């Protein structure tokens, strides 16, 4: 329902801490927020701001539907879900990249040799679009976690996954074959909120842009 | 067969919902008629080639397609404007223009269904055919504002833009087709992050880059038009900016300016728009309520060049905001009794006076009917008459 609070959906987990640091620099309220407590909504009456704690994959849903005006979420989630939201600012932190990785044993394989092979991934949309754009037919096997296990157990020939340092790949004797895209944290915005709460949102966006391009807010 | 399935994204409408719908339709029809618009209807499906005169082939995955027995490809209409353009090019060639037409119709799109987005959706809309210029644009926008007001909405904004500003800048940028399409889709989707990255990599005038980068976020009163540094260098863009100013000024005359904001990010999805474009929003709903604009080239594609402008209002979405519209209902009576002839006579008498009458067709006693009435006082407002 409509109120004059600005509602921001925050991703729980690793993105929360750097997000709160950015908010601090922008002089947005943030006392008492953590994702360990049972509270899922944090309201600051003086500042007319409300935060809601969401699983990262739910943030675009809240924003698309207008249950939140703004959201903080990784580009990986945005691309995978292809939600109808505005992507306003690259906040730079939370870097990771999408890669195709194969077992060490076949590390010299080329991309075209992967035609008609199987790829395990948590991100079927990104994987499918990538292989299609390369003119390849790849069978996508959707898994919910521990993707690295799939090639080890013969379930898949390769994986499409998010990598930040590459340590997990190494531990499972996988090597990065090709990078699909980079991902960092983004500020997203509901289509209508952007217009109806423009006076609250636009300065925030400008300050975030300044901050993320190295200046100070 | 006990299947109760219906296809995804469709729905049944029950009396309470339909009452709100009819209320909206009546308000819309009366308003449109008061501006001398007349109602038309077009077929529910058309040849794909006709549909794509309007959509430009970009949304084929959103169309419900099927074949007729002669091998023609048909599409359920995804919107009304293209069908009406075809209708005008067929039947109104000799008419006196401008022609003012309206419709209350359903359209179909294979979209991801969710709240306020169905695969069969209903629109009320108008098309003003054969009139160029800002006065025609202003008339259509004024009617859009009044339509929302008539239906009882007061907290809403209409975002106004002139699409030729962006198009002229892009056309004269020296970019190739692919680069233009890329920038267009990034601006439409407001992917500012990728947009600034792409602009960075292009070899074009820095002021032009700056202007394209700022367009999607320029929003406010008419003064935001001063923030377009490159526009002075592009005659067509400059003319479009001037036209936008004139539309804005004319809307002041029309008395609806309180609801208007300039928003250079409004580009509209369909390919056919050529000039002034606009969208309506309410802060209570995360989706747009109405959209429209000028499409001067569409009728020409049907061999009948003719300037045109119009809008469509999404009634399914608006209905979500009209929780308690002032629905007028005639008092309703329940008439029963042993002598059925007397019951019928009494009921007819009341109906003639304009009341709604429900007669007891089950031959129940007074006590039984009184019991039946309990809890229905809001519905049977006139009460029980036992003859």
UniProtKB/Swiss-Prot annotation, chain A:
One of its GO terms (molecular function) is ATP binding. It catalyses: 1-(5-phospho-beta-D-ribosyl)-ATP + diphosphate = 5-phospho-alpha-D-ribose 1-diphosphate + ATP. SUPFAM superfamilies: Periplasmic binding protein-like II. Gene3D superfamilies: Periplasmic binding protein-like II. InterPro entries: ATP_PRibTrfase_cat, ATP_PRibTrfase_CS, ATP_PRibTrfase_HisG, ATP_PRibTrfase_HisG_short. Pathway: Amino-acid biosynthesis; L-histidine biosynthesis; L-histidine from 5-phospho-alpha-D-ribose 1-diphosphate: step 1/9. Disulfide bonds: none annotated. GO terms for biological process: L-histidine biosynthetic process. Keywords: Amino-acid biosynthesis, ATP-binding, Cytoplasm, Glycosyltransferase, Histidine biosynthesis, Nucleotide-binding, Transferase. It is found in: Cytoplasm. One of its GO terms (cellular component) is cytoplasm. Its EC number is 2.4.2.17. NCBIfam families: hisG. Heteromultimer composed of HisG and HisZ subunits. Catalyzes the condensation of ATP and 5-phosphoribose 1-diphosphate to form N'-(5'-phosphoribosyl)-ATP (PR-ATP). Has a crucial role in the pathway because the rate of histidine biosynthesis seems to be controlled primarily by regulation of HisG enzymatic activity. This is ATP phosphoribosyltransferase. It comes from Syntrophomonas wolfei subsp. wolfei (strain DSM 2245B / Goettingen). The lineage of its organism: Bacteria, Bacillati, Bacillota, Clostridia, Eubacteriales.
